[in-house]
């Protein structure tokens, strides 16, 4: 999708501000609109009527530099992207960050022809021209919810894929697992082999891919544990297999866990944090979603 440029004809519909010193977008807006509450400013961002250098920006902590132009549309708000299984968290000329709901595939396989995050986003960007499309950078399992990033051109896709471990600084998940974790923190290392329908784990190098998961126990209650997980590698089903290795499978995981333990009717795994250096500007981008409420309830309610 091309940058959404503001035409000269429409210029009178915007209030323009020039950035004179480095600061985050929210701080800048608060200074320019002192009577507006933080909630009001976030609402303006969510309505997609804030532009930075002619690009719609919804990230409240977007880093501004001297010389940038911030524009606020006087329109009521742009028509937002709406879909029950995903939402756009951030978009610019190079990338789209989404929050995917559980149950939605990231991308089709040869055997699966259903609508996916990839096909839905392609339809969205093609509203601005049939030549536009998004490009896969990484994936989430169908039953895992959370943050994903797509590239909007092939050059950005190559940059992200070829430099993934240098560009992505933090990719974190939260899960609810069966039983109370023995350790407050630890690391799981194993070699994973993908047999299509099942990923097998070995504690020694048997020709599989070395896979490393760091974990931290947040809370134990009601026979469950709320756990944060940080991937050092990103293999297929890695977290699910590693939690099985620890003897604490993820709730709702019928493949690597217990089919009859599913109190919330879904896999209790969510990608809640994604931090990376922007592939074009080099700026550090931080995105974080709250823990799903249904996860927290499992370790809060009394039985």
Residues of each region from the PLM?
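The conserved catalytic core of RNA pseudouridine synthases
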Residues: 130-161, 170, 189-190, 194-246, ...
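Thr-Gly-centered strand-to-loop micro-motif
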Residues: 52-53, 107-108, 151, 202-204, ...
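Edge beta-strands of extracellular beta-sandwich domains
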Residues: 83-85, 250-253
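RNA pseudouridine synthases
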Residues: 1-187, 191-196, 294-301
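Conserved hydrophobic positions within beta-strands
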Residues: 88, 177, 214-217, 250
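Short glycine-rich, acidic/polar surface loops and turns
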Residues: 260-264, 272-273
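Short, surface-exposed loop/helix-turn segments at secondary-structure junctions
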Residues: 252-261
